[in-house]
Amino acid sequence: MTVFSKKMTATIPAMLLCALLSGATTMSYADTTNPNAPVSLIEQWDKTFPESAKVDHRKVTFQNRYGITLVGDLYLPKDRGERKLAAIAVSGPFGAVKEQSSGLYAQTLAEQGFVTLAFDPSYTGESGGYPRNVASPDINTEDFSAAVDFLGLQKEVDRNRIGLLGICGWGGMALNDAAMDTRVKAVATSVMYDMSRAMGHGVGDGKDRYTTADRRAVLQYLNAQRWKDAANGTFAPGGHDIYVDDKGNVSAAARILPETLPANPNPVLKEFFDYYRMPRGFHARSVNSTGAWNATMPLSFMNMPLLSYASEVTIPTLIVTGEQAHSRYFAEDAFKAIGSKEKALVIVPGANHVDLYDNAAGKIPFATFAQFFKTNLK
């Protein structure tokens, strides 16, 4: 249902008449009076990691520039006193929720003296936005700036000492925002993806996977799905890692991860499955754990490169990745493109991509992240 202002109601009959006379039909995807409102605000602790006794936790909401209400977890060190502290906005991985990796990073850094905010991106988790399970290079970059807005208004925060930390696909978003938002004073990524490159060119073995013909085939596949969605008045779910075989045939899985792991799985699939689908990292609100994105979601990423202005990231930058991470090439290429003279690339020995999600293997270099932000948010 669409809600119109009083001013608009006078024009509705004329609009409907025009539609009838022209033989026009309308598409209606939503039936909600406030699609930008939070989906939920769960107060009890429902994270995939234990609550720290050293940190105060608050459930918070804030709006981005598009009017979507985001839901976050604010973490504050218990021993903060009355002084204003540096703050860090944290999000990711791509398709995860704040109760997973980003919350763990945020809480751990709060133990080190920072005010931190882990938040659900627009259209996912508890945050508002319709249709559900959509990502956008523009709106999700804005989500980081909205988090900066929120942090800068908190009485515990020194607004001149705010940084960003993006995990997995949110690493690219963090770098994109750091190039745009001059209020951000330091930026870090962990096992970053450039999602525009991943979806626009395919994730290969240390390099892009799609040929020019493959890209065209993927675009045709996605736009054919648009016709189906338009005809059905709904948004079909579908995987965002789209495959093109040697004959140009295009396919995508119905889910991000299978319900059960197949025999002899791809090692990267097993990494993700062992986190998102198992008790270790499963969360009911995580699209990676339970389902799929909107099938046409990759369209905006195909032609909107996130790191076009990486050379304009001139603030201190920390890029962390795993020695064995399949995503390592994203981090190394981003590091080369970053314009800052104060940048560091840290490759964690023996770590794969998901090792840096939850520290089950003890490989997340939290001390490195903490020292980076202490040095550059002072």
What are these regions (language model features)?
Residues 108-128:
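Conserved alpha/beta-hydrolase
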Residues 83-93:
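Short beta-strand element of the alpha/beta-hydrolase
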Residues 37-83:
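N-terminal cap/lid segment of alpha/beta-hydrolase-fold proteins
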Residues 313, 319-321:
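Short beta-strand/loop motif that positions the catalytic acidic residue
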Residues 134-155:
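Alpha/beta-hydrolase active-site loop
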Residues 95-107, 121, 331:
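The serine-hydrolase catalytic nucleophile loop
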Residues 176-272:
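Alpha/beta-hydrolase-fold enzymes
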Residues 349-351, 359-378:
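Catalytic active-site module of serine/aspartate enzymes centered on a nucleophile-bearing elbow/loop
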